[in-house]
Each structure stands twice: as C-alpha cells, then as structure tokens.
Curated annotation (Swiss-Prot):
It catalyses: ATP + H2O + 4 H(+)(in) = ADP + phosphate + 5 H(+)(out). GO terms for molecular function: ADP binding; ATP binding; proton-transporting ATP synthase activity, rotational mechanism. The gene is atpA. HAMAP family: ATP_synth_alpha_bact (MF_01346). Produces ATP from ADP in the presence of a proton gradient across the membrane. The alpha chain is a regulatory subunit. Coiled coil: none annotated. The record marks 374 as: Required for activity. It is a peripheral membrane protein. F-type ATPases have 2 components, CF(1) - the catalytic core - and CF(0) - the membrane proton channel. CF(1) has five subunits: alpha(3), beta(3), gamma(1), delta(1), epsilon(1). CF(0) has three main subunits: a(1), b(2) and c(9-12). The alpha and beta chains form an alternating ring which encloses part of the gamma chain. CF(1) is attached to CF(0) by a central stalk formed by the gamma and epsilon chains, while a peripheral stalk is formed by the delta and b chains. It is found in: Cell inner membrane. The keyword Transport applies. This is ATP synthase subunit alpha. Its EC number is 7.1.2.2. PROSITE patterns: ATPASE_ALPHA_BETA.
Length: 514
C-alpha cells in the first residue's frame, strides 16, 4: 500500500485551498437571517455599499442601510411577505434609480417611479439616482426671479423666489396643502414644471388633489409622487428623494421647477420607524441622530444653478440659461408647537417659513397666514417690482393692527388716529382673505394692493371689502384690459400706471356697484 508523506498531504491541501474561490461568492452573496416589519438581516455581503440595491429571489429588492461587522440590515422596497429565512441575497452594484423626464408630466407614480394611475406604462427609458449630491456654492446663483403663488398674503408679504426653500408650517387641517396646491395651479402658464410629493396621506386625499389639479388644468404640468399611508415606511422615506430627482431633471437642463413635499413630518416618522427597527440608538423624541441630515441633504438640492452649470451638465446643448428647483416643504405641528425637534430642524434649513395659525383659520381668515411670524429670507430680491412697491405698508398695517387690537380690548375710548389705524388694519385683514382654487394674476393683486395702499378702501364697509375687490377687478379687466395686460407682462410700476389705476378706481367708486 502506497504511503503518503505528511509534507505531500500538506501540499495537496494547500493546492486545494489555493484553487478554491470562496471570496467572490461570500463577499457578494449572503443569506437571509431574519425578516420582520419590512427589515431584513443578511449574513454575508461583505462587499455591499451603503444604499446599494440588494436582490432577493422573486424580483424583490432591498436597500442596505446598516453595515455591521458580520451582517447587513436592509429595508425591503415593496412587499416582504414572500421573503423567508435562509433565502439568498445578492449585491447588485447599483444604487436606487427612478425614471425622469417630461414623459412623467401628468402622471401619478409611486416612490420607485412605477405608474399607479391606470394610464399604462411610462414611455421613457431615462433614469437617475435617487440620492444625489447638491450643487456646490460655485455652481449656484442668487435668487432674483419670482415664483407667483397667486396668494396676496404670500406674494405681497412673504415672496418666494425661484430656487428658494420656503417652509409651510402649521397644525393639521388649516390649509397648508391648499396653499401649496394653489401655488401649483398658478404655475400652469408660467413655464414652471411642478412635482407634488404626497407622503403618508390617505389615498382618498391624494386622489382628491389629483382631481383638483386636473379640473384646474394644472395636472399636465405636474408629476405626482404618491407614497400613501398604506405604503411601507421605506417607500414613505424614499418618496421625497425620488420626487426631488424628477424635479432636478428640469433644473439641470435650464428649466424651472417647483416641488412640494407634503409633508416632511410623516417622512421623519417613517425614518424613525426604520431606524428603530434597525436597532439604531434613539435620540430626542426617539428620532435617530441623523434626522437633521435626512432633511438637509434633501432640501439643499433645491437651488438656482448658474448658466455654466447647465452648460456643463448638458455638454453645451443648453447655453445661457439658468435652472432652478424651488421647494415648498410642509411641516405639521402639534398644537402650534414650532419648537419641537423636526419643525426647528426644517426652519433652520429653509430660507423662511409661512406660518399658518389655527386661531386665524377658525376666525375665518383664510389663508390663515400669520404675517408677524412668517418670513422670507431671500424672496425680497425676487419680488415683482409693482408688488414690492405697493405692498410696503401692508405688513406694517397688519402688525400695528394686531398690536392695537390687543390694546383696544382694555381701553374704553380711543383717539382718532388709533381708531383709523384699527379700521385700516381690519380692512387690510379682510382684503388678504382669498378663496381656494382662485389664484390671482399680478395685475389683479396689484390693483387690490393699490386700493388699500392709497386709501381707496377707507369709506368702504368692512363687510363689503370682498365684494368691492371682486367688482373692482372685474371692472378693470373689462374697461381697462390694456392696462392690466401691460402690468401682467412687465410687472413695473410707473406714473402712467399710477394715474391709470387712480382714475379707474375713482370712476368705479362713483358707480357704487358693489
């Protein structure tokens, strides 16, 4: 019998080990250890990267979020009921991408870009990464062009510019979504493309928003990204980033876009749920430590970019055009508490906030914009000239009125000047009221502000301010159409427009037809 030398045995074993290729298999493949609540733990996958797509059997995908020493924590994108312990998982070497392009306009898609409106598949083939780095300081341009929301209270006192991030904050059911939807409706003829991201809302609410956009002719100009309350936390967390990528498509090609995130409080809650299930240490209000970064990396992507950036991005196909992505994030507060964790975070990230107040809403002042607390940090430079010129006294009148109204409750007799200020404040407050789904043109808005600024409302009964304004606008659009068209086109204020408005209002008031 042939005997083997111990050294020969060692050589054979070494040779076998050298030939055995387990590294590639073990590093790019893994085994599912546990599945629960949309979270999968995988053993192996040593080469996986943060945010990488992981493929499971049956065409199910996940996203790697926790990279630990001997396991990976991932969220499942979609239904996880088909996954079971012991199944294989593979690295794909790709990060999550969603469809982008003008083919998405007029469509309702989910957080992964799949159409959910029953209008058939999307025709485009272009996709882009969901997570992208925001443009650097060098590529940015200052905000100096307006986004007209169509609301007097906003465009006159808290103007929004192209490339700005303006927060809409307030309690539930006081008109935050209504304000944002009206802003989208007002863009249908402005050349600004819109993206509406619904996060954690009822499907009936989303369907109602889509119907209103369609009725007002704005859906053809809008992409709706829906991650309803029935969707998984992973899709609610991803939806804003998907919508932002779709909006950036227009920005990077020298176009202007507006994106509404409705609302980021629910995204933060979804992210908190994912983080707690991944066993990450909780912080204030049980949110994870990186919840600020969650919103800052999203909102920093909204910007106005320079001509050089657009030219570089399009390889010279588009020249001499700036692009912009304007963001209107919405935050829901609890009982008006703006000092909670998520509201303070988003206030510090954005370029101003529109604060909606429950007390004003309940007293019939709609939109319930509190001009004293609301601010636009960069929009002033972007405001239309005529609106800027005529709105100077509006904010002051409202601020003085609020102060005097509180004082007048205790004082029995008021002097003439104080009484006049109070009455003027009441008239301006009444003038700032506006119906939903009725955004105003620049000329209509300028006319209302002119009447208030130049004292033409002094002898109009407070109860009739609304009907006076409607009749005045109808009169000017009928008998002074040329003047109104001129204001809408140029947005300038000069002596000719001043004289035309003054003469027209005096003539209208003489008719007493309101």
């Amino acid at each position: 019998m042939q005997q083997l030398n111990p050294s020969e045995i060692s050589e054979i074993i070494k040779g076998r080990i050298d030939k055995l290729d387990v590294t590639s298999q073990a590093r790019n493949e893994g085994t599912v250890v546990s599945v629960s609540d949309g979270i999968v733990r995988i053993h192996g996958l040593a080469d996986v990267m943060y945010g990488e797509m992981i493929e499971f059997p049956g065409g199910v995908y996940g996203m790697a979020l926790n990279l630990e020493q001997d396991s990976v924590g991932a969220v499942v994108l979609g239904a996880y009921t088909t996954l079971a312990e012991g199944m294989s998982a593979k690295c794909t070497g790709r990060i999550l991408e969603v469809p982008v392009g003008k083919e998405l306009l007029g469509r309702v898609v989910d957080a992964l870009g799949n159409p959910v409106d029953g209008k058939g598949p999307l025709n485009n083939t272009e996709t882009d990464a969901v997570e992208k780095v925001a443009p650097g300081v060098i590529w940015r341009k200052s905000v100096d062009q307006p986004v007209q929301t169509g609301y007097k209270a906003v465009d006159a006192m808290i103007p929004v510019g192209r490339g700005q991030r303006e927060l809409i904050i307030g309690d539930r059911q006081i008109g935050k979504t209504a304000l944002a939807i009206d802003a989208i409706i007002n863009q249908k003829n402005s050349g600004i493309f819109c993206v509406y991201v619904a996060i954690g809302q009822k499907q009936s609410t989303i369907a109602n928003v889509v119907r209103k956009l369609e009725e007002n002719g704005a859906l053809a100009n809008t992409i709706v990204v829906a991650a309803s309350a029935s969707e998984s936390a992973a899709l609610q967390f991803l939806a804003p980033y998907s919508g932002c990528t779709m909006g950036e498509f227009f920005r990077d090609r020298g176009e202007d876009a507006l994106i509404v995130y409705d609302d980021l409080s629910k995204q933060a809650v979804a992210y908190r749920q994912i983080s707690l299930l991944l066993r990450r240490p909780p912080g204030r209000e049980a949110y994870p430590g990186d919840v600020f970064y969650l919103h800052s990396r999203l909102l920093e992507r909204a910007s106005r970019v320079s001509e050089e950036y657009v030219e570089k991005f399009t390889n010279g196909a588009v020249t001499g055009k700036t692009g912009s992505l304007t963001a209107l994030p919405i935050i829901e507060t609890q009982a008006g508490d703006v000092s909670a964790f998520v509201p303070t975070n988003v206030i510090s990230i954005t370029d101003g906030q529109i604060f909606l107040e429950s007390a004003m809403f309940n007293s019939g002042i709609r939109p319930a914009v509190n001009a004293g607390v609301s601010v636009s940090r960069v929009g002033g430079a972007a405001q239309t000239k005529i609106i800027k010129k005529l709105s100077g006294g509006i904010r002051t009148a409202l601020a003085q009125y609020r102060e005097l109204a509180a004082f007048a409750q205790f004082a029995s007799d008021l002097d003439e000047a104080t009484r006049k200020q109070l009455e003027h404040g009441q008239r301006v407050t009444e003038l700032m009221k506006q119906k939903q789904y009725a955004p105003m043109s620049i000329a209509d808005m300028a006319l209302s502000l002119y009447a208030a600024e130049r004292g033409f409302l002094t002898d109009v009964e407070i109860a009739k301010i609304g009907s006076f304004e409607q009749a005045l606008i109808a009169y000017f659009n009928r008998d002074h159409a040329d003047l109104m068209a001129k204001i809408n086109v140029k947005g300038d204020f000069n002596d000719e427009i001043d004289a035309g408005m003054k003469a027209g209002i005096e003539k209208f008031k003489a008719t007493q037809t309101w």
